[in-house]
Regions:
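C-terminal regions of proteins
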Residues: 361-365
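Hydrophobic h-region of N-terminal signal peptides that target proteins for export
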Residues: 10-18
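Beta-rich carbohydrate-recognition and catalytic domains
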Residues: 20-46, 51-114, 124-253, 258-305, ...
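Elongated alpha-helical scaffolds
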Residues: 116-118
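Sec-dependent signal peptide recognition
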Residues: 2-8
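Enrichment for repetitive, rod-forming helical segments
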Residues: 9-10, 276
Length: 400
């Protein structure tokens, strides 16, 4: 009897994760096999940034919400947290947790607000140090900060540094601090006219190495009129604008990039245009040398989700959702996802795609390559499907 029950459960799981690919192979990962790496007391997480170092140490940055008022949707007590483990222990990871910043916390001279949350880590491998960029809320509003972390002990440095942005307009170079006023000045100086409102700029969750530089692409959280800005850096702190992407006419709230043969592939979630038919995930292609638009951004997915790109074994892959993270059944939210992984051609169009349906919500992807293998971190609510504010960080190897 037990064997019958087990067989029935396995069959149901197989149906729940029914996958298809144009070409016949299975989806590159089974979400049920992913290991959970977020803090065990985690109640909510909707960010994931991952760095895999040479020795196999994995650092996953995310946010943790100890208290959440699910009635009015307001957050409190949010912490920026880093989970550390090693790939050799992937099946049963031994995890170390480091808190970067808490609400009301302080590093050096920067005092985090007692009432506003701290947000969104973006990890940068600085060689002998791990650098964590994150959002604090201080005297100048949202501020993008950087703090160094000892990769062995996970101890934090005793000071934070503000991230700067340098750009050129009419032959004149300007440098602003990545604060609310600074980023607004950047947009005004480059001539963005329909900038509706400001929250905070959002870099890609990981930095991309190309030649002597690290590259990133910056969007802006839910701000109509915002456009992506491709930047480069050597230290993860001082960012220099290479070119902007005004072709993303519906804005770019959250972005990701991959670079191949001096072509810069950019994928972005729209910044909530008033015309809901325009909302979704868009893909574009640019020349890294002069910023020429080689493929005008086109809608690759009809649902606003936080996508990612990965250059792996000479191929560019895109991952994003193709339906909402929840549906309403009998007056209640039921969470599930349909995930698509697409292989991108040289011109930025889709060559082929894999899809998988999950019985729970999966989103916020970050793909990494390490020694010829591909890995994925993402946010999921495997055990907490009843509430969208609850989530876990999961990690798995991709079969690419």
């Amino acid at each position: 009897m037990k064997r019958v029950v087990v067989a029935l459960v396995m069959a149901l799981l197989a149906v729940g994760f029914a996958s298809a690919r144009k070409g016949g192979a299975s989806f590159p990962f089974d979400p049920m096999e992913a290991v959970l790496v977020s803090h065990p007391d985690n109640l909510m997480s909707h960010t994931t940034s991952t760095v895999i170092r040479e020795n196999g140490d994995v650092f996953v940055g995310h946010i943790r919400d100890q208290k959440h008022n699910h009635e009015d949707g307001k957050s409190s007590s949010i912490e920026v947290v880093i989970s550390k483990f090693n790939l050799k222990d992937l099946k049963a990871p031994r995890i170390t947790y480091t808190t970067v910043m808490s609400v009301g916390g302080q590093i050096g001279d920067f005092k985090q607000s007692d009432t506003m949350p701290t947000y969104d880590p973006f990890l940068f491998d600085a060689g002998d140090k791990l650098r964590c960029l994150f959002y604090g809320y201080g005297e100048e509003g949202w501020t993008l900060l950087s703090v160094d972390i000892d990769p062995k002990s996970c101890e934090l440095a005793k000071e934070v540094k503000p991230v700067t942005l340098t750009y050129e307009v009419d032959g004149k170079r300007n440098t602003v601090s990545m604060t609310a006023p600074g980023f607004r000045k950047f947009y005004e100086d480059i001539g963005v006219k329909d900038f509706k409102r400001y929250e905070r700029p959002i870099p890609d969750k990981k930095f991309t190495r190309h030649g002597d530089w690290w590259y990133n692409v910056i969007g802006n959280w839910c701000c109509r009129g915002s456009i992506p800005a491709v930047v480069r850096t050597k230290n993860g702190i001082d960012l220099e604008v290479v070119f902007t992407c005004p072709e993303f006419v519906w804005g770019a709230a959250e972005t990701a990039m991959a670079i191949k043969d001096d072509r810069c592939y950019i994928i972005a979630r729209t910044a909530r245009p008033s015309d809901k038919s325009k909302r979704g995930v868009y893909m574009g292609c640019y020349s890294l040398t002069d910023g020429e638009c080689l493929r005008k951004p086109y809608k690759i997915g009809s649902v606003e989700s936080r996508p990612d790109l990965l250059l792996f074994k000479g191929k560019v892959y895109a991952m994003y959702n193709t339906d909402p993270s929840y549906v309403t059944e009998e007056g209640k939210r039921v969470y599930r996802s349909r995930i698509r992984l697409s292989e991108i051609m040289k011109d930025g169009s889709v060559l082929r795609a894999w899809e998988i349906s999950s019985p729970y919500s999966i989103q916020y992807y970050c793909m990494n390559e390490h020694k010829g293998k591909a890995y994925l971190s993402f946010v999921e609510d495997r055990f907490l499907r009843a509430n969208s504010y609850k989530g876990n960080i999961a990690f798995i190897q991709l079969d690419l």
